[in-house]
From Swiss-Prot:
InterPro entries: LCN-type_CS_alpha_beta_dom, Scorpion_toxin-like, Scorpion_toxin-like_sf, Scorpion_toxinL. It comes from Centruroides noxius. Keywords: Disulfide bond, Ion channel impairing toxin, Neurotoxin, Secreted, Toxin, Voltage-gated sodium channel impairing toxin. It is found in: Secreted. This is Beta-toxin Cn8.
Length: 67
């Protein structure tokens, strides 16, 4: 599974500025989803890879982004 990291409180994606390989996104993906996860900046959001099937990613059902 793959997807954007989501902030459970705001319903928004984790933003990033440096596209492609991105230490911030990689660190956040691993912290949220475990050591096996990968991550990079895609379309100015942190995109995580190698997630378990039940991982919660953006968009959250019935919750719009409220920054």
């Amino acid at each position: 599974k793959e997807g954007y990291i989501v902030n459970y409180y705001t319903g928004c994606k984790f933003a990033c500025a440096k596209l492609g390989d991105n230490d911030y996104c990689l660190r956040e993906c691993k912290a949220r989803y475990g050591k096996g996860a990968g991550g990079y900046c895609y379309a100015f959001g942190c995109w995580c890879t190698h997630l378990y099937e039940q991982a919660v990613v953006w968009p959250l059902p019935k919750k719009k982004c409220r920054a």
